A protein has these predicted regions:
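Acidic, Mg2+-coordinating catalytic module of metal-dependent nucleases/exonucleases
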Residues: 129-168
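Generic N-terminal initiation segments characterized by hydrophobic and/or small/turn-forming residues
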Residues: 1-4, 146
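Short alpha-helical interface elements
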Residues: 62, 71, 128-129, 149-152, ...
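Solvent-exposed, non-transmembrane amphipathic alpha-helical segments
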Residues: 29-30, 66, 124, 144, ...
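Mg2+-dependent endonuclease catalytic cores in nucleic-acid-processing enzymes, primarily RNase H-like
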Residues: 3-133, 188-216
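Acidic two-metal-ion nuclease catalytic site recognized across multiple nuclease folds
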Residues: 152-216
Length: 216
């Protein structure tokens, strides 16, 4: 559970032996608690994946009654060229996972997201790049990370609805895509940086060296 627009984790529930009906009841209880404490359900947002086990969750939510869960059930926008029947929630693919992982990495590295959960921090420590994707090390789990990635995808949708989320989310995106360093031909002291956030700070360090040399 994350608070916006601070991106601070405020709660967490994890239990791998609870069936999907039980999970939906817990989701409802959490949303009810937030709505009661905040005295409003208009700022409560929740969602689920709609592929894999998530398909079963959609069936249970339908039986449980979406109207019985406070807040808004957030779904990804219909993409251009989408041919399948629309389903609520978020469909996780290789591409969407990579994008969400990249954003999570950027936000954590730049202190844009505050993680309070020790179990989640433990999962992050064993979450590694494997080939062209990310996965937990052998024997480790990534359930909490998957939930966080879903929360990030929800935030990406919410930024188009709430200007406060839009502003903070866009500030985070400014740290992304910073690898390649090139000199501008017209402005020799102007350096364009593109690539990953990790290399952004390395690029800034190199810029400082260049500026110091040019001032000598």
């Amino acid at each position: 559970v994350f608070e916006l627009p601070s991106y601070e984790q405020v709660a967490e529930w994890q239990h791998n032996q609870t069936g999907i009906p039980g999970q939906v009841r817990v989701l409802s209880d959490i949303c009810n608690y937030i709505a009661t404490e905040s005295k409003s359900d208009t700022n409560v947002y929740w969602s689920v994946e709609n592929n894999g086990i998530g398909e079963a969750a959609l069936i249970v939510i339908n039986d449980f009654g979406e109207e019985n869960i406070p807040g808004l059930f957030v779904s990804e926008p219909i993409r251009k060229g989408h041919v399948r029947k629309f389903r609520k929630g978020f469909n996780t693919t290789h591409g969407t996972k990579i994008t969400a992982c990249s954003r999570l990495k950027t936000m954590v590295e730049n202190d844009k997201m505050i993680i309070r959960s020790k179990p989640l921090i433990g999962e992050l420590k064993s979450f590694i790049a494997t080939g062209s994707s990310y996965t937990a090390k052998s024997g480790a789990h990534d359930d909490l990370i998957s939930a966080t990635l879903l929360a990030l995808r929800m935030m990406e949708v919410l930024k188009d609805w709430d200007p406060r989320v839009y502003n903070t989310f866009n500030q985070t995106e400014e740290f992304e895509d910073y690898t390649k360093i090139t000199h501008d031909k017209d402005e020799p002291n102007l350096i364009i940086i593109k690539g990953t956030s990790t290399e952004y700070f390395e690029a800034r360090r190199r810029i400082s060296k260049i500026v110091r040399k040019s001032s000598l």
